[in-house]
Amino acid sequence: MTIEDIGLVGINVRMWRHLAVLYPTPGSSWRKFAFVLPVTAMNLMQFVYLLRMWGDLPAFILNMFFFSAIFNALMRTWLVIIKRRQFEEFLGQLATLFHSILDSTDEWGRGILRRAEREARNLAILNLSASFLDIVGALVSPLFREERAHPFGLALPGVSMTSSPVYEVIYLAQLPTPLLLSMMYMPFVSLFAGLAIFGKAMLQILVHRLGQIGGEEQSEEERFQRLASCIAYHTQVMRYVWQLNKLVANIVAVEAIIFGSIICSLLFCLNIITSPTQVISIVMYILTMLYVLFTYYNRANEICLENNRVAEAVYNVPWYEAGTRFRKTLLIFLMQTQHPMEIRVGNVYPMTLAMFQSLLNASYSYFTMLRGVTGK
């Protein structure tokens, strides 16, 4: 079974392998540049367009959203390309842990693994479908405007983008963007969610194994061996979460700033525009940002919650039936489980639902302050 056959990450890794973002070969390495460079050029032209739209605040904010979203997608993709070896090594570690559970005699653990695979696969399909439809909506929205406009505003010095045939050529060039941007934007979100779901599943399996320790039918040595196995497994899970945090800590910190600023700006834009089409578009964009943020923080929060259940399971092990060696080892293990197992934003703040709420509160606070200053 290859990494693409593991449902937790298979869809996303398969796309990235095809595009040579991960696991490139000498014959396919050019694909990542053919994938990323046109979008990079489009993002630069969006920036030029933003400079021209400085005086029109609603149009500026809307195009700033598109610029930031595509810049964020590029940032994620370049991160994976630059850290390709680290991502490939981490996925190799995931495959090893996955197969160790799949090949074990623990039927309950295999059931947890199958449910985790199904959940991650369904989430990846949902994310790609929603992103594709979202961008299709942005693609057709200019058709309902009175003036000529492109789905993603672009500009070049000395070129009129609204005169024929430049307008038609640019519009046709943007037709592949639903597929292109969906494959660039959502795989990272789905991969993060799949990796976090696997971390949660491993902790659930550990809780179950701890619950199997004890009982009159188990000898002292058997109990100790089961406990030692759980400690070794917990150490593996800790290493897995630590390496996941090392890979994503900085990117999620940058995204927290970008998403918070975008939500604040879109709320302000919603307060000053009158076009029903633009209102619907902005509400859709805000919901998209909230969904991506919630996916990040909810999945990371589940690891924290499950780690707390591990500590409870250790505490509930019937230590009073065992000898001194078992009790001392269990006490040390209990102290180890008190160490927080979490993904941190910029290695500073834990990714929890409380942090998600704090980001929303900060965005809304800046929005009300901006509205008060402008009197809108």
From Swiss-Prot:
Residues 1-32, 80-123, 200-247, 298-342 are cytoplasmic. The keyword Signal does not apply. It is found in: Cell membrane. It is a multi-pass membrane protein. One of its GO terms (molecular function) is olfactory receptor activity. Expressed with Orco in 20 sensory neurons on the distal edge of the antenna. Residues 54-58, 145-178, 269-276, 364-376 are extracellular. Keywords: Cell membrane, Membrane, Olfaction, Receptor, Sensory transduction, Transducer, Transmembrane, Transmembrane helix. It holds the Pfam family 7tm_6. Interacts with Orco. Complexes exist early in the endomembrane system in olfactory sensory neurons (OSNs), coupling these complexes to the conserved ciliary trafficking pathway. Odorant receptor which mediates acceptance or avoidance behavior, depending on its substrates. The odorant receptor repertoire encodes a large collection of odor stimuli that vary widely in identity, intensity, and duration. Complexes with Orco to form odorant-sensing units, providing sensitive and prolonged odorant signaling and calcium permeability. They are necessary and sufficient to promote functional reconstitution of odor-evoked signaling in sensory neurons that normally respond only to carbon dioxide. This is Odorant receptor 43a. It comes from Drosophila melanogaster. The lineage of its organism: Eukaryota, Metazoa, Ecdysozoa, Arthropoda, Hexapoda.
